[in-house]
């Protein structure tokens, strides 16, 4: 055994061994417990960042631990390889996105391997390869034929300069991120998944996921947004509108119907279009509403604007004439593109009514009273007893709901309805680097799915996009084709799919990545699925995790999987944060400096109180800790850390510095500390091994001092097993190992029994560290005399007998204050403990002259004497 700990050599040797032995290749083994551990696969951006390292280390620790429990463990890896960044990089570097993507994958794969992850690389999937997306296209055609995918017009952000559609995040202050042109809202035909058909099930089956964080389930419940309300129809005023009809609205507050003073419609609503005829000012306002972002978040924060029309509708219960307004806060694709406005009890309507001098009528008695003032109060939105509501006065919310519904049904002007906030999922993207949509547009036959024997529709990979619209739409060699039904000349769809589609089913493909007869091999999929443990960032709580759950149900309904949910347990890891440093630039902006380029000064409590740039020695501002990012220049390159300290040190620091679900603050001194600890373990093992391995430990012959050491070893095993197995608290498990190391370093090594006990301790340390620092554990296990590999060793078991104590120390309190200690046999009775406490010399001083009222004995811990 080498005297020095040399991580580079140790890690290279372990990784070579795992590769040669194919240690992590898995096959289905019926009858053996399975465990599927999956971390969210990365986008191949170019190189790993510390967030990746943390995510994949957490997954690897769990996977290796489960393997030590004797389970057949699957831990695969792949690449979420389609998407905008590749197109942007391609334009910047004048290189095809495919080339850029594949080069990044090669480099990042090398990085992942250097971390020593227990991954079955034979199952690798790359979503931009035709053998992957072919099956996505196959499923698309099946769902299109069933009507679960349909085509309709959707509102998008249109950049008139680049002639392309922009995502919401590409619209900055109403302008295109690249062209700077004012953005317009456009209606274009798009494909949609009917996810709303599954809304109820997606909501209800959240209750089948006790292994998910409550926060994530709440976020999904809110996103799905089930609400019971009322569909209310306001009859058209024939005199102003010119024909009969009704304006349909949905409200969750039908109890406030008697307080409606106007109605508002979206700019795209037919009534808005009618009102704008011959009214250029209104038409201009409608055009203004149609430009700008279609993002819901932007709509919520923008200034509320409106314009009156000359149109009126009738209140369904009173017949009162209400004015129709066009408002920018009403969305055509939400509800029915119209709202009834009750300014007294809705903040948005209140703001609008005050701005445009519209009537406010209170109809609910709230904790703020019966009147509504000139400033909005949260109380105005409360439920309460109805007032100013004719025959409905005095009713509470539930009573009013039923009574108003009955009145509307009698007039055939309304009924209760359940509505969801969730909208159908539009997946058409006018982008190049994505999965082609397998539809052919025929002048005679309409939209025709590409037949199975013509799949995949392959994306040409030698294209360099220029940013002006989709390159596919300018490639006749791609879109010119013949109709599969009638053989006439037809046009292939040039939109590609939202990249969330690929990541919605990849977890299932890992079960049979090379299967060529279908999306998944049902036998393999049902052997492994659902995933036992899924690990990823909380930022994916809604979209990715909701879409993956939806896709799992689609696959179930296609007969491909039998389970209802894809992920049994979910761990959302915290961010990796680091200090930030900057100087204010001459233009008022900030120049950010990497922590590695800054020299810091700390106070006695280790708080940073000053910082200077190493190059010029001049001060820089301290910006506090922030998530590692390029924009703040506070990232640490994992590769440089691995080269300097080794992967095991990085893994140990990541797991020790914070519980996995909390933010982790990067600390160079913490990394140094992790490295020092591994050197200590190596040093102790090397000194032990160099004297020759001892014989077997005779547990029955241990003296009291040896029993204390053995108790420390097994107490650590017990606690670490709970921490890792039940709570994923790797930081406290590592703390247990450190405690044992302190004991072992001080333990005597004079006799054969002493050395046999040290051998047991070092084996326990090696096994407890094996999932966390696998390379050093691989080497230590061999040096400690084991023929097999540590990855095939079992997790250490607790000898409960070792934890039994012959005697225990109890603290003695008088009136809750510590006044002494007594050493007692572990089996001592309550009476014996009380007698010993009362006769303790120090305790006697504090109870002298007092009357003892009560003696409380907490077995094994303390005695409290209450006296006055």
Swiss-Prot record:
Per the Swiss-Prot or TrEMBL annotation, the motif 'HIGH' region is positioned at 42-52
Q: Which GO terms describe its cellular component?
A: cytosol
Which residues does ATP bind?
630
Instruction: Set out the biological process GO terms recorded for this chain's protein.
Output: leucyl-tRNA aminoacylation
State the top-level EC class: ligase
Q: What is its EC number?
A: 6.1.1.4
| Keyword line | Aminoacyl-tRNA synthetase, ATP-binding, Cytoplasm, Ligase, Nucleotide-binding, Protein biosynthesis
Q: Which reaction does it catalyse?
A: tRNA(Leu) + L-leucine + ATP = L-leucyl-tRNA(Leu) + AMP + diphosphate
Q: Name the principal localization, coarsely classed.
A: cytoplasm
In alphabetical order, the GO MF annotations are: aminoacyl-tRNA deacylase activity; ATP binding; leucine-tRNA ligase activity
The subcellular location is:
Cytoplasm
Short motif ('KMSKS' region): ranges: 627-631
NCBIfam families this protein is in?
leuS_bact
Q: Which family does it belong to?
A: Belongs to the class-I aminoacyl-tRNA synthetase family.
Q: Supply the name of the protein.
A: Leucine--tRNA ligase
Q: What species was this sequence derived from?
A: Pseudomonas putida (strain ATCC 47054 / DSM 6125 / CFBP 8728 / NCIMB 11950 / KT2440)
